[in-house]
Amino acid sequence: MESTITIENVVASTALATEFDLVKIMDSGLEGAEYNKTKFPGLVYRIDNPKAAFLIFTSGKVVCTGAKTINNAHKAITNLANKLKDIGCDKINLEPEIHVQNIVASADLKTTLNLNTIAIAFGLENVEYEPEVFPGLIYRVEAPKVVVLVFSSGKLVITGGKCEEDCNGGLRIVRKEFDNLGLLC
């Protein structure tokens, strides 16, 4: 049975302005915003539709995290840009260039795995497995450049992709490698 990925998190960044006055943004009554520069240099702002969280910095740069799709990350950033304009922020870029920094996806191979066997079969080149430190096997895929965390339950976490196809490619490679080793039913 073919496994499919589920996107769990998309992290994207952009520049919405050349600078932000974070205190002014807080004072404008941006509902749900948190800013304490002694704890963190950015303002944290969360929205529900689409669900996402933002880190907003004085440099005008913004990081969006928590979106479940690339499209939702774009929508969330566009909504934020309009909200910042509405509360009086100057020179907001309403059509910013958005860069996906990381996609985290999950998958289930629907079989249990012996991670010791996999670690021995793969050697030390692209694999790390230290069960005393971390219960998963870390498999670094060269192309696409992703990291796949493999758990004995057969569950996978794929991280480092810049697009959905990177994550799918990582899953295909892992499935093929495990199938070649006779590990998949």
UniProtKB/Swiss-Prot annotation:
Sequence repeats lie at residues 7-84, 100-178. The keyword Electron transport does not apply. One of its GO terms (molecular function) is general transcription initiation factor activity. It comes from the Archaea. HAMAP family: TATA_bind_prot_arch. General factor that plays a role in the activation of archaeal genes transcribed by RNA polymerase. Binds specifically to the TATA box promoter element which lies close to the position of transcription initiation. This is TATA-box-binding protein 3. It comes from Methanosarcina acetivorans (strain ATCC 35395 / DSM 2834 / JCM 12185 / C2A). The gene is tbp3.
